[in-house]
Amino acid sequence: MNAIWIAVAAVSLLGLAFGAILGYASRRFAVEDDPVVEKIDKILPQSQCAQCGYPGCRPYAEAISCNGEKINRCAPGGEAVMLKIAELLNVEPQPLDGEAQELTPARMVAVIDENNCIGCTKCIQACPVDAIVGATRAMHTVMSDLCTGCNLCVDPCPTHCISLQPVAETPDSWKWDLNTIPVRIIPVEHHA
């Protein structure tokens, strides 16, 4: 019994010593990140879709900050992300890449043709935001609220049953411009 307590104490002391060494090393050799890169990375939608030409949102943020890359290449983020980055960097907003005539493209979402889906799960594996649900050899479906329209699920589909379609506008998804709606404050009379 005494040997067990000695072993427990020895392992605990070793864990404490190695933890202290790692804690000291993490502070001593810490690498400071560029705060601008961090801010740009927080603005980007984190869909890791690679439509901008970079393998993910973090490398794209680094390219914008360090290499002067265009701020208009994020397709899932669209105009809203581009405008936030332009405001952060204090630069002129640019038309979205490849869409010089239209600044606000329609939001696209993946749609699966349920009659042709064979349940191979290749689209589920390709989706960077887990917007597709389903099981092997069962029909899959896309959760449109989570879909970023990154187009990464379309190519892996062996039956070509996935397509991108614009999201239909509903009163809930419509972007109301509340500044143009006339509002009048009606005074309320208090009766005692």
Curated annotation (Swiss-Prot):
[4Fe-4S] cluster 2 binds at residues 117, 120, 123, 157. Residues 1-26 are annotated as: Hydrophobic. Its cofactor is [4Fe-4S] cluster. The keyword Manganese does not apply. This is Ion-translocating oxidoreductase complex subunit B. One of its GO terms (biological process) is electron transport chain. One of its GO terms (cellular component) is plasma membrane. The keyword Protease does not apply. [4Fe-4S] cluster 3 binds at residues 127, 147, 150, 153. Residues 108-137, 138-167 form the 4Fe-4S ferredoxin-type domain. InterPro entries: 4Fe-4S_dom, 4Fe4S_Fe-S-bd, 4Fe4S_Fe_S_CS, 4Fe4S_Ferredoxin_RnfB, Elect_transpt_cplx_RnfB/RsxB, RnfB/RsxB_Proteobac. Part of a membrane-bound complex that couples electron transfer with translocation of ions across the membrane. Required to maintain the reduced state of SoxR. Its main location: membrane. One of its GO terms (molecular function) is electron transfer activity. Its EC number is 7.-.-.-. Residues 32-91 form the 4Fe-4S domain. Belongs to the 4Fe4S bacterial-type ferredoxin family. RnfB subfamily. Binds 3 [4Fe-4S] clusters.
